[in-house]
Structures are given as C-alpha cells and as structure tokens.
Amino acid sequence: MVLDELISEFDRGLRSLTGISRMSRPVPVPAEPTVGELTPAERAHAAGLMRVNHVGEVCAQALYQAQKLTARSASSKAMFEEAAREEEDHLAWTAHRLKELDSRPSLLNPLWYAGALAIGVAAGTLGDKVSLGFMAETERQVESHLDGHLSELPATDTASRAIVEQMRVDEVKHGKAATDAGGIELPLPARMLMRAASKVMTRTAYYL
C-alpha cells in the first residue's frame, strides 16, 4: 500500500515537472471575448506573471504530495489529495496559457519542486495541525499574490485573468478547509519567512 502510494506520487511529480498534467476541469474562459491585441510589452509581462503562477503550482504539487505522505489521519490525507488534484488543474491551465503567450515555464522548476517537497515533509512531520496550518497560511499568501496579479495583468488579457480568478476561488476554498479541519495559526516568524521565500521565488521565476 505504501509502495503504491509512493509510486503514484512519484508519477505525479514527474508529470508536474514534464508538463504532462491531468486536467479534470477545462481551462476557464472569459465571460466576454478579448477586445484588441496585447502589445509586445503586455504579452511579455503577462507571460512573466503566468510563469510565476505556474511555478507556484509546481510548488503546490510538491507541498501537498509531501504533506499527504506525512499526514497522520485519513481525513488530512484526503484533504491534501483533493487540494493537489485541483492544483493540478491550475498547473495545466497556466502551462496552457504560457503556450498561448509563446512563452515557457521556469527553467528552475526542478529546484522549486525539490525545495517545496522538503518544506512539505518538514511541515508534515510536525503533525497534522501544524501541517494544515501551513496549508492555510500558504493559501492566504497565494490569495494575496493572485490579487496582485489581477491588478497587474493587462485589462485586455481576459484569458489570463479568467484563469487567475478561478485559481483564486480555489485557493480561498483550500485555505478555509484547512482552517476548518483544525489547522493552527503559524507563529509570526514562520509567516514572515514564508513571505520572504515567496518573494525570492516570484522575482526569480518572472524572468527564469
């Protein structure tokens, strides 16, 4: 049973890094069609933002895989599995949009994945309440990060905006579920460290 689970998660990790993601929901589409073409500068900026979002989803896969494998209770395992499934949609959506923008994922994805996997294992070994609290805080920070992207994306890039808006809805749901399941609030130093690490990742992934 444990071996089967490890093989399954290894397969998911490979798919995350190779871009072969399974999409359970279609790519969100804007309510109204895009009016006008993006300028080269707007296209480049949108691609940078969507690359950052794609990296975030690579990290989410690693985090939730590690937290699922280290979770003590069946209910916590199920929660991390459900979140990972929805985040895999996000991974596929952002990869799809990057292709539409004639861009590419981050060249450092293996590094981001490995780091997030280690962090997920560390959080999981501290117990389910801490691990769920880490999930809740992660989702809160991602929600804030997506709000920032919605304010930065060109108004005419309705395709990217539709994806980010649905991602935000899902992240809010994941964070609330983790809190409702008993996740504790992390101490301030831990939250600040998470924000600092996130800034390094987002600034680097925008270009690389």
Curated annotation (Swiss-Prot):
Catalyzed reactions per annotation: a 5-methoxy-2-methyl-3-(all-trans-polyprenyl)benzene-1,4-diol + AH2 + O2 = a 3-demethylubiquinol + A + H2O
Keyword presence, Cell membrane: yes
Protein name stated in the entry: 3-demethoxyubiquinol 3-hydroxylase
Lineage, uppermost ranks: Bacteria, Pseudomonadati, Pseudomonadota, Betaproteobacteria, Burkholderiales
Protein family according to the UniProt entry: Belongs to the COQ7 family.
Pathway(s): Cofactor biosynthesis; ubiquinone biosynthesis
Record-listed Fe cation 2 binding positions: 87, 139, 171, 174
Cofactor(s) demanded: Fe cation
Source organism of this protein record: Burkholderia ambifaria (strain ATCC BAA-244 / DSM 16087 / CCUG 44356 / LMG 19182 / AMMD)
Gene Ontology, cellular component aspect: plasma membrane
An example molecular function term from Gene Ontology annotations: 3-demethoxyubiquinol 3-hydroxylase activity
GO biological process, one term: ubiquinone biosynthetic process
Function description: Catalyzes the hydroxylation of 2-nonaprenyl-3-methyl-6-methoxy-1,4-benzoquinol during ubiquinone biosynthesis.
Cross-referenced CDD domains: DMQH
Membrane topology (UniProt): Peripheral membrane protein
Binding site for Fe cation 1: 57, 87, 90, 171
EC numbers for this chain: 1.14.99.60
